[in-house]
Amino acid sequence: SSIFIVKNFDPSQDYRILLAVDDSPGTSRAIKYGARVAQAFNIGVDILTVSKNEEFRDGYKGAAHRAAKFLRRSGIDAKNIFKVGDPSDTIVEIATNNHIIIMGASTRSPLKKFFIGSKPLDVMENCSCPILIVK
């Protein structure tokens, strides 16, 4: 199941997907959903990978490159964007009104979400564009 939150949607707007990618289990499902949406609406995908420090984990880079390869093989215009910073804040900063954010749901336990928070929830609360959270 997935959650689609629509904020400031304009049917006349030329959209791109902002696909948030890391090495979490939800990323592969988000990539597949992103491909379906991109194909259905004939739009391109910006694959965003954010690391808290300059050293990107191998899993992050690998996931981003696999996503780009999968999307391009599906006939979708895709480009990778690598940024350093807080993941939630960076996703919100990069996302513009012509983006539809697609990201995997958090895999944290309810207790961890309460104390630490959740990237998808943080993004959802702070972004001004549509967002699809894939579970």
Language-model features: where?
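Generic structural signal for helix capping and beta-alpha/helix-loop junctions
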Residues: 12-13, 55, 88-90, 112
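Short acidic active-site motifs
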Residues: 86-91, 118-119
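Gly/Ser-rich helix-loop-strand patches that form or flank binding pockets
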Residues: 1-9, 97-135
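Small/aliphatic-rich secondary-structure junction motif
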Residues: 13-61, 65-81, 94, 100, ...
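Structured loop/turn residues at secondary-structure junctions
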Residues: 9, 22-23, 83, 107
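Conserved beta-strand termini and adjacent loop/short-helix elements that scaffold enzyme active sites
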Residues: 6-8, 48-50, 81-85, 134
